[in-house]
Structure formats: structure tokens, C-alpha cells
Swiss-Prot record:
InterPro entries per UniProt: TGT (IPR004803), TGT-like_sf (IPR036511), tRNA_ribo_trans-like (IPR002616)
Single Gene Ontology MF annotation: metal ion binding
Subunit structure: Homodimer. Within each dimer, one monomer is responsible for RNA recognition and catalysis, while the other monomer binds to the replacement base PreQ1.
BP term (GO), one: tRNA-guanine transglycosylation
Pathway(s): tRNA modification; tRNA-queuosine biosynthesis
Enzyme Commission (EC) number: 2.4.2.29
Keyword Hydrolase carried by entry: no
Cofactor: how and how many bound: Binds 1 zinc ion per subunit.
Taxonomy, superkingdom: Bacteria
Gene it is expressed from: tgt
Function (record text): Catalyzes the base-exchange of a guanine (G) residue with the queuine precursor 7-aminomethyl-7-deazaguanine (PreQ1) at position 34 (anticodon wobble position) in tRNAs with GU(N) anticodons (tRNA-Asp, -Asn, -His and -Tyr). Catalysis occurs through a double-displacement mechanism. The nucleophile active site attacks the C1' of nucleotide 34 to detach the guanine base from the RNA, forming a covalent enzyme-RNA intermediate. The proton acceptor active site deprotonates the incoming PreQ1, allowing a nucleophilic attack on the C1' of the ribose to form the product.
Co-factor requirement: Zn(2+)
Name the UniProt record assigns to this protein: Queuine tRNA-ribosyltransferase
Record: active site: 90 (proton acceptor), 271 (nucleophile)
Length: 377
């Protein structure tokens, strides 16, 4: 892996991340393909209509179904899906946290029940990496101890201490694999925890950086119930503690506004189900704000979703047609709406990158907000 930082404009960064399955210009938004598939889309959409250099798969879900060992027999995620570009896999800790009421955390790992059949499973830091090796992920996330917010201070303290110990176990396990000539193209990211507490974020960041050579650092435990202002403040004081020569990934975030504010605070990578989930539910993102395509007001609207969008959907179809497809329950709506929302997100970060490279980031950010709420949406 190679990470080259080209330009910093304020704290916003433009860089290139080189991985085994292609280069990734940052800032970057990564579409979420939980089940090794971005919902409603195929590879032609991802490669041609959206041009995504990296997508996410989820360790928890793929371990349970179809099984990581089965995927390994079929050539890992790339052989299994035939998607030729990069995969990042989450550790599954968030799903164990969010999908199961009977999850138990211990020093060994996370015990959880399958949401599919109720069977019990144990995720340890080492087990998670073994799964991710089977998936042959380009970027692997370590297992972390996630806490929902608000949470007692003692629970957050326990979380960062356990996350650090698990990260150390992950790093030692990964280094042992590399010493045997294995896992040479699987790159490991640590995850900073600490809630919205400045002291805890500093402790977590410095502890993880001090462990050794992680390939990148994620900021986890945000967008889990705290106000946006607290999330932005947390990013403001967390990113300076992370190495400048390593990529920074804000997990599970978020709205276009969240992404703009995180880029402004030095974050490079993002993922979220929002663009595809909102698309399926009738909410489309535009340069002028959100648009509810289910509204009767669009029944005779011949305009594209967004006059400034270059996506396949906006080039070929009107708001009226999308309104009809949604209200009729047509499956084609899900594809066309998802193409648009993901293209909007990818164009948002591409525009940010161009602005940073030309040192006009402040103006790009200003223009982003100036257009929000205009009548067009």
C-alpha cells in the first residue's frame, strides 16, 4: 500500500491511495455492499455509471452467509463477485453491536447470536482477521469495542482500553502472517474510539499510533446518537493526533454536510448506507438539497433530478418518470435512484478533491452551502 499526500488546503487533504486492485483518489466515498453487493446495482453501474474505485463488504454478514471459507474457495471477494476494484471490509463489530440484543463483550472478544438462525458465535481480534484474509480484503478493519452514545464515562474508558488491546492483538497476528509471506496485499486499519470526550479521543489516538505500523486509522464510534455539532468538534480535535502520512477514515458517515465538514477537518475516506437507503425510500440528493421524489408535485415535472448532475439517470430520465416508477413500485426505480444518489456522493468528493488541489477548498465549501435550500430541489 502506498499513500501519497499531494496538497493540504487548510486541513482538507487531497491524496492518492494505491492498493492491489487500483488507485483511489481521496477524499473518497465508498458505496456500501454489505452482502458483497451494493443494493439494486450491478458491476456495470458501479464501474461505468458511478465509477467507484472501492466498495465495502461486511465481515459479520459474509461470515454468516455464504460463509468466508466458501468465499475463499471461490477466490475471495474479487473472485466471488468479479468486481475488479478494491474492497474494504468492516470487522463486524458494529453489526454485532446493532443487530443483537444479547451481545456480550469480554476480553476475549464479542459473543453474539446470529440474526439469521440464532446460533452463537465468538468474534476475537484474530478470528476477524482470519475471516478477512479469506475474503481477501484490500483494507481490513480491526475488531473494536463500540459504544452507543450517550454512555457512562467508565464505559467509554473501558471501550478505548479494550479497543487498544484488541488492536495490538490484531497487529501482532497480522505481522506474524506477513512474516510467513502471507497477507501481503491485505492492509490493516486501527479504529479510534472515545465517544465525544476530548481526553479519551486523545488517549485512544495516541495509544493506537504508538502500537506500531497500522496502514491507516479510522475514527469510529460517531454518528451513533450524538448531535452533529459534537461529532464535528470530535473530528476537530481527533485528526491532529493521527499521522499525516496515513489515510484517515470516518466510519459510517453520513450526510453530504457531514462529509464536507469532515473533509474540512482532515478526513480522507467515508462510507454510509444513506445514499442507497434513502434512494430506495424516495429521497434523492441534489446540489440544491434533498428531493422527495414520491411527492405529487413531480408528477408532471420534465426536469432531471438535478440539473447539475451528470449521472445516467439525470441524462436519460425525468423527475416525472422517477415519480411514476416509485409510486408504481417498479424495481427499476431502485436502480435508477441509487445510481443518482451514489453518483452525487462520488461527484461531491471528486469536486472536493479538485478544489483542494487548486487550493480553492474554502470557496467550494462556501458554494456547497450557498446552493442548499434553493427552490430547484
Amino acid at each position: 500500500m502506498n499513500f501519497t499526500l499531494h496538497v493540504t488546503d487548510g486541513r482538507a487533504r487531497a491524496a492518492t491511495l494505491e492498493l492491489a486492485h487500483g488507485s483511489i483518489p481521496t477524499p473518497i466515498f465508498m458505496p456500501v455492499g454489505t452482502q458483497a453487493s451494493v443494493k439494486a446495482l450491478d458491476h456495470t453501474d458501479l464501474l461505468e455509471h458511478i465509477d467507484a474505485p472501492i466498495i465495502l463488504g461486511n465481515t459479520y454478514h459474509l461470515y454468516l452467509r455464504p460463509g468466508d471459507e466458501n468465499i475463499a474457495k471461490l477466490g475471495g471477494l474479487h473472485g466471488f463477485t468479479k468486481f475488479p476494484r478494491n474492497f474494504l471490509t468492516d470487522s463486524g463489530g458494529f453489526q454485532a453491536f446493532s443487530l443483537n440484543t444479547n451481545t456480550k463483550h469480554s476480553e476475549e472478544g464479542i459473543i453474539f447470536k446470529s440474526h439469521i438462525d440464532g446460533s452463537k458465535h465468538l468474534f476475537t481480534p484474530e478470528k476477524v482477521l482470519e475471516i478477512e484474509y479469506n475474503l481477501n480484503s484490500d483494507i481490513m478493519m480491526v475488531l473494536d469495542d463500540l459504544v452507543g452514545l450517550p454512555a457512562p464515562r467508565e464505559r467509554i474508558k473501558e471501550s478505548i482500553e479494550r479497543t487498544t488491546r484488541w488492536a495490538e492483538r490484531s497487529l501482532l497476528f497480522h505481522q506474524a502472517q506477513k512474516e510467513q509471506g502471507k497477507a501481503l496485499t491485505n492492509h490493516l486499519f486501527a479504529i479510534v474510539q472515545g465517544g465525544t470526550d476530548v481526553e479519551f479521543r486523545e488517549i485512544s489516538s495516541k495509544a493506537l499510533v504508538g502500537l506500531g505500523e497500522f496502514d491507516g486509522f479510522a475514527i469510529g464510534g460517531l454518528a451513533v446518537g450524538e448531535p452533529n455539532e459534537e461529532m464535528y468538534a470530535t473530528l476537530e480535535y481527533t485528526t491532529p493526533w493521527l499521522p499525516k502520512h496515513k489515510p484517515r477514515y470516518l466510519m459510517g458517515v453520513g450526510t453530504p454536510e457531514d462529509i464536507i465538514e469532515a473533509i474540512d477537518r482532515g478526513v480522507d475516506m467515508f462510507d454510509c448506507v444513506m445514499p442507497t437507503r434513502n434512494a430506495r425510500n424516495g429521497t434523492l440528493f441534489t446540489h440544491f438539497g434533498k428531493l422527495s421524489i414520491k411527492s405529487p408535485r413531480y408528477k408532471l415535472d420534465e426536469n432531471p433530478i438535478d440539473s447539475e448532475c451528470d449521472c445516467y439517470t439525470c441524462k436519460h430520465h425525468s423527475r416525472a418518470y422517477l415519480n411514476h416508477l416509485y409510486r408504481s413500485g417498479e424495481f427499476s426505480y431502485f436502480r435508477l435512484a441509487s445510481i443518482h444518489n451514489l453518483r452525487y456522493y462520488l461527484n461531491l468528493v471528486r469536486g472536493a478533491r479538485e478544489a483542494i488541489l487548486s487550493r480553492t477548498w474554502a470557496e467550494y465549501r462556501r458554494q456547497f452551502y450557498a446552493k442548499r435550500g434553493a427552490d430547484e430541489a
